[in-house]
């Protein structure tokens, strides 16, 4: 299982709201580095294969949103959802799911995901390069705990969802045994 001691350096291309931008779409590009995102903070990051996909949309992201307050109450400063998608897709997906408390982090070129050892080929599904599903607790840039779904490989037949879920992460932070993945939080259509 790939495991680093600290998060790798990467630059993320994000879009931020800026009322000084004229027009009906007041957003501008802003680069964010790994250091800006992780240094001096306790962060839960969960990574998934793609926005608008079944498990990601019905359970993975919605459950982290649902448990946001409890994770924060246990010392987490920020929860991040990362996917090898662009900033526009991540914004619209978060908006579609009503994710108000999760930072939607686009890794459009897969640079961070590649350095994490989690970039996989999913051409068998027409996805191209994507992130393998995992979650991690990062404290001041150092990876304290990482939950990687089994079977990490290119063109995997399945999409396991057993350990990177919000309930497992919360159980780890609380120091208790996880009870397993919760049932889907929303219906997936498509």
Language-model-detected regions and their locations in the chain:
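Chalcogenol-based redox active-site neighborhoods
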Residues: 1-190
């Amino acid at each position: 299982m790939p495991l680093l001691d600290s998060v790798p350096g990467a630059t993320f291309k994000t879009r931020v709201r800026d009322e000084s931008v004229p027009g009906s779409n007041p957003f501008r590009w802003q680069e964010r580095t790994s250091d800006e995102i992780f240094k001096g903070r306790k962060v839960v990051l969960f990574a998934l294969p793609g926005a608008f996909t079944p498990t990601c949309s019905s359970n993975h992201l919605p459950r982290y949103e649902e448990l946001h307050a409890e994770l924060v109450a246990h010392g987490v400063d920020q929860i991040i959802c990362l996917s090898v998608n662009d900033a526009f897709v991540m914004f619209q997906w978060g908006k579609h799911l009503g994710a108000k408390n999760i930072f939607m982090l686009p890794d459009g070129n897969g640079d961070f995901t590649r350095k994490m050892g989690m970039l996989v080929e999913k051409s068998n599904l027409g996805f191209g390069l994507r992130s393998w599903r995992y979650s991690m607790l990062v404290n001041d840039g150092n990876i304290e705990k990482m939950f990687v779904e089994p079977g990490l490989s290119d063109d995997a037949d399945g999409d396991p969802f057993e350990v990177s879920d919000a309930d497992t992460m919360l159980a780890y932070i609380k120091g208790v045994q996880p009870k397993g993945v919760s049932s889907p939080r929303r219906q997936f259509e498509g």
